Amino acid sequence: MVLSIKKKEQIVCKIQEVFKISSSAVIASLSNITSNSMNQLRKESRDCGVYIKVIPNTLLRRALKNSLYECLSNFCIGQNIIAFSINNPSDAARVLVNFSKNNEYFKIAGAVCEGNFIDKDQIDMLSRLPNYNESLLQLILILKVMSVGKLINVLKILSNQIIEE
């Protein structure tokens, strides 16, 4: 399908708008991926609040130019997909890493998180970062354990004082 120049400009503008509101982006190779697998990936990404787009490389390079994500233009070779995390920086990495575990041909090329390039070896680490709700839960559990520990220490001190008297 041949796109008109106006349609191409609209695609580039839309991707640039997504760049402005996203906290991270991950690019991956799509060769030998079935349409059913792609539909599954789209469903998972929608559920996690991740915006994914298959876009021609020349248009992607134009959209990447003069942005925080410009270093990803080196990976615009072959058929690619780009995923954007809108809410949590690790969401896109988490969705694509989980998808790559079930699809041997799906290869993650690189990512950018808040302006810093992350190579494919470190993307697993990014995908394991807790999201906002998980972080809050961990903080609450730590505070809860600390307060119970303090209460036990106070009770132990009081019991020692009572025994001494």
Curated annotation (Swiss-Prot):
What family does this chain come from, according to its entry?
Answer: Belongs to the universal ribosomal protein uL10 family.
Single Gene Ontology MF annotation: large ribosomal subunit rRNA binding
Q: Which Gene3D superfamilies match?
A: 3.30.70.1730
Cite a GO CC annotation: ribosome
Fetch the HAMAP family from UniProt. Answer: Ribosomal_uL10
Q: Name one GO biological process term.
A: translation
Q: What is this protein called?
A: Large ribosomal subunit protein uL10
Superkingdom is Bacteria
Q: Does the keyword Nucleotidyltransferase apply?
A: no
SUPFAM superfamilies on file: Ribosomal protein L10-like
Subunit composition?
Part of the ribosomal stalk of the 50S ribosomal subunit. The N-terminus interacts with L11 and the large rRNA to form the base of the stalk. The C-terminus forms an elongated spine to which L12 dimers bind in a sequential fashion forming a multimeric L10(L12)X complex.
What the entry lists under NCBIfam families is as follows:
PRK00099.1-1
State the UniProt keywords alphabetically. Ribonucleoprotein, Ribosomal protein, RNA-binding, rRNA-binding
Q: Which InterPro entries match?
A: Ribosomal_uL10, Ribosomal_uL10-like_sf, Ribosomal_uL10_bac, Ribosomal_uL10_bac_type
